[in-house]
Amino acid sequence: MKTKLQYYLPKMLITKFFGWLAEKKAGIITYWIILFFIKIYKINLKEIKTKDIKSYNTFNDFFSRRIKIDCRRIDYDPSIIICPADGIITNFGYIENTEKLQLKNHNYTLKSLLAQNETMIDIFQHGIFFTTYLSPKNYHRIHMPCDGSLIKMIYVPGQLFSVNLKFYKNISNIFSKNERVICLFKTNFGYMIQILVGSIISGTISTSWYGKINYKRDGIIKLWKYNINSNNKPIFLKKGDEMGFFTLGSTVITLFSKKNILIKENLSNYKEVRVGDVLAYGIQNVK
């Protein structure tokens, strides 16, 4: 019943309202809302960089909080690929072809997930993927799994279905339907994509080099190029560098273009992970 209700809810209106509310500077009200949130979701205050709750002017300021550098261990061994976010690994595996990519118990096509971009479909049709779900309790900044140079970024408008673990199984192709930002990088392991998937109540999707991507929500696909022939400044990020963040829970899908990456042996579905945890081991200098 709750799943069917999502099809009829004014999801965009709800998201805009909560996004507006989360950006309001409401003084003591904001302070008490944050305290309530901390209690409900058992937020670990020991790892927060700014512990003074009163210093957060809005709820979003707290939600997108930074943590202390030493709270997440990054292994800088160049052959190691790390988890980009705190959350739960809901699925991972090898992409057999363009027609078979299973995410959260649903079969997707690369064509639908990558917004019909034929170039990227060709690159990733024999690749590897990891899906990380971020719940409201998690640290919500997204980091780089390995060193990479940004090639392009695509904003894909879409629905705002909840990606909560209680609902995703009953909504087919949810990641292809939902709003998302696709970031393509060139790495020493070949090409990599980080897909930041939106969700109901998720106010914004932001990247470290651009800021808020979906603030207009005008229903138009947008493309930014960052290669040497574009007008945009080249972007290079190191492993562990912040590359983006959500306001409220959502999902990150990480794709690699080659099958010369070995998934960590004891990695399992529905395993809790943190930024810096080892996902896989790779062979470098892929052409």
Curated annotation (Swiss-Prot):
Its cofactor is pyruvate. Its EC number is 4.1.1.65. The keyword Lyase applies. Its main location: membrane. GO terms for biological process: phosphatidylethanolamine biosynthetic process. It comes from the Bacteria. It is found in: Cell membrane. Binds 1 pyruvoyl group covalently per subunit. Is synthesized initially as an inactive proenzyme. Formation of the active enzyme involves a self-maturation process in which the active site pyruvoyl group is generated from an internal serine residue via an autocatalytic post-translational modification. Two non-identical subunits are generated from the proenzyme in this reaction, and the pyruvate is formed at the N-terminus of the alpha chain, which is derived from the carboxyl end of the proenzyme. Heterodimer of a large membrane-associated beta subunit and a small pyruvoyl-containing alpha subunit. This is Phosphatidylserine decarboxylase proenzyme. It comes from Wigglesworthia glossinidia brevipalpis. The gene is psd.
